[in-house]
Swiss-Prot record:
GO terms for cellular component: cytoplasm. It catalyses: CMP + ATP = CDP + ADP; dCMP + ATP = dCDP + ADP. GO terms for biological process: pyrimidine nucleotide metabolic process. This is Cytidylate kinase. The gene is cmk. InterPro entries: Cyt_kin_arch, Cytidylate_kinase_dom, P-loop_NTPase. Belongs to the cytidylate kinase family. Type 2 subfamily. It is found in: Cytoplasm. One of its GO terms (molecular function) is CMP kinase activity. Pfam families: Cytidylate_kin2 (PF13189).
């Protein structure tokens, strides 16, 4: 079974993907894993590669291609990433959501950052990503039609999600 798990930062995608992987006994690959692999292939650290990726849409496109290829090569796999459901063949496509303030609080705790700083960073990142995804892929991130299930993780802790 191929499962994609997507969602905005702070919704719990990485945590849920990891827990599902452990409980189902199937591998999990995140878009972040693919990004780190691509940086290593170029012998760049993550920060350097991130700067390059901001200016080069081909990097986003390659991440999507690699995740789609992984889905084609495996019978059982969990793919975690914001756009995984749009590009990978999957039996189940899940979107996790949570209110803005809940996500900001989770990220603030996780990264030990001031909540107001996190809120501003989220706003900037989400505007930037929405624009990039629309320009590069023609994807409207607010269109949920591609997903089979949408789960609000607001009331769940990591294990319950």
């Amino acid at each position: 079974m191929i499962i994609t798990i997507g969602g905005l930062a702070g919704t719990g995608t990485t945590t849920v993907a990891r827990i599902l992987s452990e409980r189902m006994g199937i591998p999990c690959v995140s878009a972040g894993d693919v990004f780190r692999q691509m940086a290593a292939e170029r012998e760049l650290d993550i920060l350097e590669f991130s700067r390059i990726a901001e200016e080069n849409p081909e990097i986003d496109i390659e991440i999507d291609r690699r995740q789609a290829r992984l889905a084609d090569e495996h019978e059982d796999l969990i793919l975690e990433g914001r756009l995984s459901a749009h590009f990978a063949r999957a039996d189940l496509k899940v979107l996790l959501i949570a209110p803005f303030d809940v996500r900001a609080q989770r990220i603030s705790v996780r990264e030990s950052k001031d909540i107001e700083t996190v809120r501003e960073e989220i706003r900037i990142r989400e505007r930037s990503e929405a624009q990039r995804y629309r320009e590069i892929h023609g994807i409207d991130v607010d269109d949920l039609e591609v997903y089979d299930i949408v789960i609000n993780t607001n009331r769940f802790d990591a294990e319950a999600s």
